[in-house]
């Protein structure tokens, strides 16, 4: 049995035993000021304002290690027991009315909402990874103009307007947009100003219903544009982009999961209109497609 197969079997065993979110773990260029995806978050290398949350480290499991730099809001993330018919624990992230990016907290005095953490692969960086998790927006969730959801990352230039140059970073978070439309929001060497929109509207999130989202990121061979991103929702492929450039050096690899979720956008026009929340569960990382039955309303 291969090492990859052993890892996948171990993850399946942990999840089946109720160990919560057991985890290891159309294209448009970026916008100018004031556009939807503008994304000025806390600097990646800034010290965390709170210590690493032990309750979340336990939730994510031994294969993902919460880094002490670049985190915020972890003290507000609650771990919830498995509900009837679901069989997994979840975490709840709250978005207070008026909250948006961390810049809006510092600049506009807005309430802080959402949460962010860098979850490093304990067994080291990779070049071809599947990340799967479940997300559920509360019943009646008001998507407003949009917000961020977790994805994969490598390096330091992954958010906040730090456009990567092929040697220092990339990321592939998701966004929800108006009406619940989904997309990949990627920081790439080809991005301008901020991130790059991929696949806007190729799927939609439905409030009150769990969705299983899975992305596969395969890094390019340095010197070639042969990387790719594929997205599945509830087991169905909804987006694929080949011929991608993530890096120009083999030293840049996929380091972990960028757990990042908040409303925004860089100003209060992106703020959450009401107090609301989203739930996340079953974070799994593998070197192959991750089978996960749709959860629906459980």
Describe the function of each predicted region.
Residues 1-16:
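N-terminal secretory signal peptides and thylakoid transit peptides that target proteins
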Residues 18, 27-211, 215-298:
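Low-complexity, Ser/Thr/Pro/Gly-rich disordered linker/stalk regions
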